[in-house]
């Protein structure tokens, strides 16, 4: 597979190696960008930049892309910067000039200074500003649409010259700008799944609507056996008399001309002129007004909100559909949808065709024989903004002359084109479904129950609309039952239809048993098909008001009664061309090997989930009539056996602190984790983990990442990263080698070195950075003796503790108390609680001076305040009334730990507190008096006591 847009003509081993190297680089750059974007939009936060480090990482990935393939500056002998490339946005896109001009003026105003801002710094500032303002994709589209302008700054192997990768890059940027992870599903997964190319090149066509002016000349080695397929327009070019190579086209009629986009990339101008395929006339080109580059970039469908396309069409609410849907082959529609090819020369009404090709690919050998002469017939079609999905898409909307135009959601064709011999009958199968019945009806399923399908909704659409990826395990279990029931019901209904069809055919054969009549009918049928196929193109030329109509069949019809393609030579005469079931089966067999493996998305091919199995089974019946989901008879009705989540036990542990909020625990919540893995919990760890043994630790984790639970093969455990805080191993997505100080190492070893921690641990440590959670006295009291700075802070906190208690009862110390409140409360109200911020400030020597200043201010207040002087102590040993002492005077005062009395250090030598002795003596005296009172009361009644004793003796 060649890198699209890499316009190079290389031959030999060097050219192949260069192309392979550029492919690997493109793959790596796009993979890094998509990984970063997935991490940003998967958090479901209102602000995508709330994820720590997300903006810096996305800036780095975009810088790598913009620097890739830059032409070196030959004059200054240095690498050029992309600032010269992007600053011309102000000319190409004036509405985006505001974001660039401010940085241009910044650069030009500082050029005269010696410390001027370099171009590289200005470019990085512009890139970061554009990402923050969510306007980077809008600024890059006009630049990336002009390939000649890109070649002035980039080499041919640059990332920006690969159309497919640029389209995926823009989709990633739009996913971030809109905070919509569903846009990432539109990216072709094959670009990430393989680095090597297959011998037979099957290129998936892309919707390159953002690159209207792209051209490409293929390498000489790729001239043969290159197939490009897209079912959005099953049209190819006949074999040229000058060349025998096959050429097929993937139409994207949103550019300036009617020439197919892939064809413009693959054919040189000379080859295009010699192609015998008829092109539209000048009058036809004049009638159609294609969108400009900006309008086309604005109308590119990247989100459900942009699908409305209010600039050129009036959409009805029922036409808007959200989410990826898959084609239900032959789905019956309650409202007939027709696609007509009408000429608008009478009313002068312009309509642009937007047949964007999807991410699916197929071999179009049969398409070259089936629709090789239809290009002129596509004079004008209603614009329909297509949505990319895992299957190919392409459907035109009906346009009635002079009436209101409205666009509908397009769905896939069947990826089937019949392959016939040269000159034989050419058959085409176009099967569509009604998108109105499927759009705008996504109801919220309560408690894991599948909602009932809407009337006329297709089976594949009904199965694929469920968000299986984000459901809990219990809901996935119920999903298996629902999907199994729907498949069984669909298969049984098809069997019944086939049996009834066989019985009808046998009855018809019995009636028409004459062999000659049967042969004559067969010859007439073949002859009519040949005549209609040959007259297909002239019929379109002669018809001005003719219609190209695709009518979806009814659900009661069998699989043989496929869609009818009606075309007429005049408005009055009409011939119906019926497509037989045998033609569908032949085309399905011819494309079975390639289309099935290519149309299914990458995640479906490598998944064993219920939805993947169901979609794979339904693809086996491609081209056949499938019943609508609403027509199925469910094996077990939901009202008889409702599918709900299993009940969670009501007896949940309630914290004593949350007793007043106990009612919140009655809510039924989903249980995260499973028997093998549980997500990390925010916990405070005080101990240093022992040196880990990787094999043993990972085995204890059941070979799963401690953060996301993803399973790792034992051969790849070396890729896991160790978190020093939690002591567990994480995958590279959950552990980005962030470095933080570890609390346990500070408390045990006074080690402030930064260690590698997981993203979860980093976020947790940042959240608790200022929380006083660490009691040094309880965790490691020996740290006071080992660390001098920490002991000094402890003494200052003891003084502040006593001062604050004194000032709370002093009416003259209100201003001083306000200054005490400037520092965190735990520093003045507790003696041993610290936060990580306090410990770090102590290590740097910043906390001690702040506390010392408060201590000096408090001591000065006590010295001149009469109220505070009255709260002092007089030493009972020396009885010096002139020397009043206070508890915060640690240099000369000693406080009793029991009674809190204060004495001079020099006087308090015996180790016994006089106040404690007095209190003890008083307690003993009170106890003695209580005992004497009890005994006196007992002696006043001796007779009663003797009588009681006698009674007791008699009873014994």
Swiss-Prot record:
Q: Does the keyword Transmembrane apply?
A: no
Provide ranges: composition bias, Low complexity: 233-242, 339-371, 547-566
**RUN domain: residues covered:** 49-190
Annotated region (Interaction with CYBA) at: 552-609
Subcellular location per UniProt equals: Late endosome; Lysosome; Early endosome
Residues annotated as region Interaction with YWHAB?
A: 205-437
Q: Which SUPFAM superfamilies does UniProt cross-reference here?
A: RUN domain-like
Phosphoprotein as a keyword of this entry, yes or no, is: yes
Any GO molecular function: phosphatidylinositol 3-kinase inhibitor activity
GO BP terms, alphabetized: autophagy; endocytosis; immune system process; negative regulation of autophagosome maturation; negative regulation of endocytosis; negative regulation of phosphatidylinositol 3-kinase/protein kinase B signal transduction
**Compositional bias (Acidic residues) at which positions?**
570-579
Ranges where the record places region Interaction with BECN1:
490-542
- Which residue ranges does the record annotate as region Interaction with Rab7? 705-956
> Region Interaction with PIK3C3: what ranges?
50-181
Q: Where is this region: Disordered?
A: 233-423, 547-579
Q: Provide the function of this protein.
A: Inhibits PIK3C3 activity; under basal conditions negatively regulates PI3K complex II (PI3KC3-C2) function in autophagy. Negatively regulates endosome maturation and degradative endocytic trafficking and impairs autophagosome maturation process. Can sequester UVRAG from association with a class C Vps complex (possibly the HOPS complex) and negatively regulates Rab7 activation.
Q: What is this protein called?
A: Run domain Beclin-1-interacting and cysteine-rich domain-containing protein
Gene behind this protein = Rubcn
């Amino acid at each position: 597979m060649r890198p699209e847009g890499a316009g190079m003509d290389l031959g030999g081993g060097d050219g192949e190696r260069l192309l392979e190297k550029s492919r690997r680089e493109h793959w790596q750059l796009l993979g890094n960008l998509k990984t970063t974007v997935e991490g940003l939009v998967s958090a479901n936060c209102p602000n995508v930049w709330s994820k720590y480090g997300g903006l810096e990482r996305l800036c780095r990935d975009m810088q790598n892309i913009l620097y890739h393939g830059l032409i070196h500056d030959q004059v200054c002998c240095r690498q050029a910067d992309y600032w010269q490339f992007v600053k011309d946005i102000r000319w190409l896109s004036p509405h985006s000039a505001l974001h660039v001009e401010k940085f241009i003026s910044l650069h030009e105003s500082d050029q005269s200074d010696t410390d001027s801002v370099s171009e590289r710094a200005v470019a990085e500032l512009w890139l970061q500003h554009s990402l923050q303002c969510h306007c980077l994709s809008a600024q890059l589209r006009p630049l990336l649409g002009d390939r000649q302008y890109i070649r002035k700054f980039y080499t041919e192997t640059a990332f920006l010259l690969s159309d497919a990768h640029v389209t995926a890059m823009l989709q990633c940027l739009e996913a971030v700008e809109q905070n919509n992870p569903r846009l990432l599903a539109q990216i072709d997964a094959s670009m990430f799944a393989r680095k090597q190319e297959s011998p037979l090149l099957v290129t998936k066509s892309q919707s390159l609507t953002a690159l209207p002016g792209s051209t490409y000349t293929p390498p000489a080695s790729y001239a043969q056996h290159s197939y490009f397929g897209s079912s959005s327009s099953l049209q190819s070019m006949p074999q040229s008399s000058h060349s025998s190579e096959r050429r097929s086209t993937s139409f994207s009629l949103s550019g300036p001309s009617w020439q197919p986009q892939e064809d413009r990339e693959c054919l040189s101008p000379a080859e295009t002129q010699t192609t015998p395929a008829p092109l539209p006339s000048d009058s036809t080109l004049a009638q159609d007004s294609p969108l400009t580059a900006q309008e086309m970039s604005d109308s590119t469908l990247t989100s459900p909100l942009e699908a409305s396309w209010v600039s050129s069409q009036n959409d009805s609410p029922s036409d808007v559909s959200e989410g990826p849907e898959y084609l239900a082959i032959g789905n019956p529609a309650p409202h007939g949808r027709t696609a007509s090819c009408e000429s608008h020369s009478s009313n002068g009404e312009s309509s642009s065709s937007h047949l964007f090709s999807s991410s699916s690919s197929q071999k179009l050998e049969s398409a070259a024989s089936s629709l090789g002469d239809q290009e002129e017939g596509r004079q004008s079609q209603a614009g329909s903004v297509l949505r990319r999905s895992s299957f190919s898409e392409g459907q035109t909307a009906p346009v009635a002359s002079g009436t209101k135009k409205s666009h509908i959601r397009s769905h896939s064709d069947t990826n089937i084109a019949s392959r016939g011999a040269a000159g034989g009958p050419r058959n085409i199968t176009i099967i569509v479904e009604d998108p109105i019945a499927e759009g705008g009806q996504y109801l919220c399923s309560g408690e894991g129950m599948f909602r009932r399908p809407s009337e006329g909704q297709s089976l594949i659409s009904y199965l694929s609309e469920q968000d299986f990826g984000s459901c809990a395990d219990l809901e996935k279990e119920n999903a298996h039952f629902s999907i199994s029931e729907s498949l069984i019901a669909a298969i049984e209904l098809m069997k019944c239809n086939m049996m009834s069809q066989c019985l009808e055919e046998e009855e018809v054969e019995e009636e028409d048993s004459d062999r000659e009549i049967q042969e004559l009918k067969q010859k007439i049928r073949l002859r009519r098909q040949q005549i209609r196929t040959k007259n297909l193109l002239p019929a379109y030329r002669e018809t001005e008001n003719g219609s190209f109509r695709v009518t979806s069949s009814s659900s009661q019809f069998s699989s043989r009664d496929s869609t009818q393609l009606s075309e007429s030579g005049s408005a009055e005469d009409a011939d119906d061309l019926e497509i037989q079931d045998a033609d569908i089966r032949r085309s399905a067999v011819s494309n079975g090997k390639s289309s099935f493996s290519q149309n299914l998305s990458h995640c479906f091919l490598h998944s064993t989930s219920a939805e993947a199995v169901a979609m794979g089974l339904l693809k086996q019946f491609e081209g056949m009539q499938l019943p609508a989901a609403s027509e199925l008879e469910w094996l077990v009705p939901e009202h008889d056996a409702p599918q709900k989540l299993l009940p969670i036990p009501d007896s949940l542990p309630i914290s004593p602190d949350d007793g007043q909020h106990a009612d919140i625990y009655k809510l039924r919540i989903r249980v995260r984790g499973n028997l093998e893995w549980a997500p990390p919990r925010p916990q405070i760890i005080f101990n240093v983990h022992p040196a880990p043994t990787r094999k043993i630790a990972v085995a204890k984790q059941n070979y799963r990442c401690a953060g996301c639970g993803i399973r790792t093969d034992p051969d790849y455990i070396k890729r896991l990263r160790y978190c020093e805080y939690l002591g567990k191993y994480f995958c590279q997505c959950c552990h980005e080698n962030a470095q933080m100080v570890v609390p346990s190492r500070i408390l045990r070893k006074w080690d402030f070195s930064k260690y590698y921690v997981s993203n979860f641990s980093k976020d947790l440590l940042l959240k608790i950075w200022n929380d006083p959670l660490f009691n040094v006295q309880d965790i490691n009291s020996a740290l006071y003796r080992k660390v001098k700075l920490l002991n000094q802070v402890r003494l200052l906190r003891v003084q502040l503790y006593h001062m604050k208690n004194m000032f709370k009862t002093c009416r003259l110390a209100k201003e001083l108390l306000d200054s005490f409140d400037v520092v965190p409360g735990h520093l003045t109200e507790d003696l041993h609680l610290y936060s990580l911020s306090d410990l770090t400030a102590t290590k740097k020597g910043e906390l001690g001076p702040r506390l010392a200043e408060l201590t000096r201010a408090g001591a000065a207040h006590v010295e001149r305040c009469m109220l505070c002087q009255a709260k002092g102590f007089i030493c009972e040993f020396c009885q010096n009334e002139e020397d009043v002492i206070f508890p915060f005077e640690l240099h000369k005062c000693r406080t009793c730990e029991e009674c809190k009395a204060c004495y001079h250090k020099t006087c308090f030598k015996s180790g016994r507190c006089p106040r404690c002795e007095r209190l003890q003596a008083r307690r003993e005296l009170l106890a003695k008096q209580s005992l004497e009172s009890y005994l006196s009361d007992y002696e006043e009644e001796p007779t009663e006591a003797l009588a009681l004793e006698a009674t007791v003796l008699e009873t014994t």
